[in-house]
Swiss-Prot record:
Involved in glycosylphosphatidylinositol-anchor biosynthesis. Transfers ethanolamine phosphate to the GPI third mannose which links the GPI-anchor to the C-terminus of the proteins by an amide bond. Involved in cell wall biosynthesis. The gene is GPI13. Glycans are attached at residues 184, 205, 336, 399, 423, 539, 707, 742, 750, 755. It comes from Eremothecium gossypii (strain ATCC 10895 / CBS 109.51 / FGSC 9923 / NRRL Y-1056) (Yeast). This is GPI ethanolamine phosphate transferase 3. Belongs to the PIGG/PIGN/PIGO family. PIGO subfamily. The keyword Disulfide bond does not apply. Its EC number is 2.-.-.-.
Amino acid sequence: MQEQIEGAVDEELLKQSVLNNDEDDRRLTKLRIERFRTTHTLYIFLYSALAALQFIAIAFFTRGFLLSRKVLDDVANRDESTAPAKFDRLVLLVVDALRFDFVIPVDVAAEGYNSHYHNHLRALYERWDESILLKFLADPPTTTLQRLKGLTTGSLPTFIDAGSNFNGDVIDEDNIIKQMCLNNKTIYFAGDDTWDALFHPYLSNVSMPYESLNVWDLDTVDNGVISFFEDHLLNNPTEKKEWDVLVGHMLGIDHVGHKYGPSHFSMAEKQSQVDGFIRQIIDAVDEDTLLVVMGDHGMDHTGNHGGDSPAELESTLWLYTKRPGTWRRQAPAAYNTTELGRYYRAVNQIDLVPSLSLLLGLPIPFNNLGWPIEELAHDDDEWRLFTRQTLMQLETYRNTSNSITDSSKLKILEELKINANSNSSDAGNYQAILLEMYKDLWARFDYYSIGTGIILLIISLAMLITITRLIPSIVVGQMLSELVPTIIVMPLVSNVCFLGVFYVLRQPAFLQNWLWASLLATAVGIIIGFYVPIFDRYNLTWLVLRFGEELSDYWSRVAAFLITLHALIFTSNSFTIWEDKIVSFSLTTLGMLTLYEFVFLPKRHSTSAILAAALGEKEGTVSGISSGQANSDSLPLGRFARIVGGYHSIVLIVCTRLASLITICREEQGAYCTPTFTLTNNYSFSVMLGCLFLVFATPACIKGYYNVSSSYQAAAPIWIGMLMKSILFVNFIYWELKTFENTSDTHGLNLTIFNLTISRIVVGVSLVAANIGWMMGPLCIKLNVHNNDRRSQQATILGYANAYGAQYFLLVINFFMCILLFNKPLAQLSLFLMCNQLLSILEIFDLLKLKENLIGPVALGLLSYQQFFSTGHQATIPAVQWDMGFILTERITFPFTHLGIVLNTFGPHILCGISVALLTLWKQPPGILRANTLLARVVSNCGMLLIYQTVLCLSTFIWVTNFRRHLMVWKIFCPRFMFAALSLIVTQLVLTFITIAFASGRLIKQIDRMFWK
């Protein structure tokens, strides 16, 4: 025992001697650590200010571009012109995502027939003599909240309303539900809680709203609606009914689409349930009750919606009454069900509002722009009555809004109005032209806000270029004590000046209120506070010349070309829809260029390394690197290094190509794209077998990279060999249970509690426990003592050559494990490939001595976008995987639901944002660079990744503005600009608060303390 204690003491003494534990060094170390801590804090403030500036720029642009129409508060009143009611009561059943081909008969031999969703909802087509079945065309965006607004107001919600699908407020403008309430009708409701959010003041207290956004729950809402109808309609005699309007909104079909896609046996089961329920309602209603069954939108082949493809826009409208002679049909050819109802008669959703108002004897809501459905008038006299009342409402709205001021347009409307009054068959032309005019009017933009946003983003880009490429990183570190205080003070000064001037004089109209004025003042203050110290040291001419010098390097020019190529994609809708292929091609091209560099140009000297050598010889104390080290970096690569580099280039190329095979297609890509990211493929046996393979392959691959630098020591085996393998196995069990749910009939077996428990364990361990362990745990190094003779003992530190990088990558592993859970099986295969791509990129740029070159961050930027597409995403609203928000919870719970969607959508961006520090830290031994120099280089690489993201965001801003009148602006360009803005925001937050604030500073300080140099 005594010998063991003495041996431990001797080893500790040896460690102290190896690490040069001198009292003077300790004192100097403390001072340097304090200086480092101050510098680190100042960097956090600097990048937080840059983030604030860019967020303000995005806010101004978004406010100016995403339209919001002017809503009139007027409410229509009943008068003598109001048509008499044809029905006393209304039963309204909304079946979410009731696509039109779901309800019509489809021949089993017809092209497009699918046994999972065709011919199960027959009730709507069988009662042909007593009902009217129509194709119901929605207006994009096809999200539930926006469709309900259109279905009840008769107006058109704008694109920005799609963002509020999670947060509906009571509709202020006139709507048919409000009119029912004002005309003393009692409204009972059960189903989607969006109704309660929009119409709460008008609904009866007995109403039963249910949470709507938990897309994994197929039955709760539907069963609740059925139970509610049983209590108040099906099992209740007509004379005892206390309601005038009974509304139900079922979600099962929509949720099956989101969870499984339409081609799943659950869709047939859910449609059969709805069919039986409708038949019960038909039997229960009397002649004085109108039954309306309708969908709010359709769904695409993946089961999603939100866009404007025909499958998403074509829904169903069915009106039924037991009273004979109520409807007047058009010619039979108008109701052609062949080719999945392609040529079937269609009406717009906004036409429902005037139609129901006329049938129920209600005033048509004031803001309505719809037109009555012709089949609802049983003769010409009634049709003339309907058209006259609707024309009066439309004319009143036009005169009150006073929006159309163009004399030529007014003349056209007056002529159409005269024709409509004399001939009711021409009345529809007036409404159609008026609707198109208002659509054009509502497409008005706030150019002051748009311009402000673009200018602020351009300036933020210039600021990033200044501190990352034009001024040496070590000099920026020295200037922080001047930059940060002025950046903090100047926004306060500018706020006082702006608000004071606006208060005394007049605030510009586009600022609207003091909040926007304050945001603009803050942005101006940050800009002034940044550039005052810069121009105190440097003049503009010198900075411009430095910019030209930065592009003189071969790899910098390659990086600039790749950034420019990506930014120019958004100049065309054709390029934008194929961005996934272009990005994959760009990353493959980069791999080919590095392979060419290693194989065919072995004597090429790294330009950046030569520059570092020159700086080292001339200004060794400023550059932070010894001249010997710099000169060694500039030497040509040896044969073994070229072989290794060629191998990693091939790995990058192959993994990129394999990942690009996993894709989800945009509608616009048509027959030129075959989707592989499908429900069937995701839960296939081969893919799940691949996920099981990943449990062992991923740790093995990472271990191989660690063994190259002898870094598989101490913490590494615990993290990679034990923790990671265990978490990946638990993750596999989770998705195996999901596969069982998706592909098998569980016979009532509820696996929810198991799934929630597993997911919470994975997130808790990977995101919380593992990161705490990383903060407090050992490094990936081991002290090897040679020769037992105490007088001649020697020691080797295994893992010393990659002490920074190996330890930092453990943090990347933590986030990788967490993000993996929130991605479907095929996406997990892609993320495994990403892990190899990432490590190969680090090895390549270490061998090429390009740790400070722009090409490194650009490569990671390309990787993040390439993996975004190969994990089942596109820059479209329907491609958002909303179901990933319910991995941690059964219902919407902030922040866990939102966290799941963010980690799923932006997982590759988060991983690349954290990993950008590894461009500096990978294969970086302690003692070569000072702590402040190392931190400065990490921050500089973070800034370069932000440059890449900012350029893309700026490009989308400019081109979406340029194409604001383009036919595809809301379908292609606008979603892409929104995604670019969100990508920049996520990257900013990750770089500022994780990479710089949490990870890099902590690790550099920890290693600097340990080695005391």
